[in-house]
Amino acid sequence: MQLKSLQNFFKNGLLGYYPNEEIDTFFYRICSMHLKLKRIDISIKSEMIIPNHTFEYFEMVIERLLNYEPIQ
């Protein structure tokens, strides 16, 4: 899966629960913590292939956010 697809998956998973701006903030924060990517890197490397374990991590984060657990 490409980074851009992961971003779309993440956003679609949280739409209706959080505002778009907050979803973007969550995504950038998680990418910073888990992938060591800055916001600009996400734009530049949008075609980057994401390993399955990273996708699974983002799925878990979505589930936790749907339960309104804070990101730490």
Language-model-detected regions and their locations in the chain:
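Non-catalytic accessory regions of SAM-dependent methyltransferases
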Residues: 1-35, 39-42
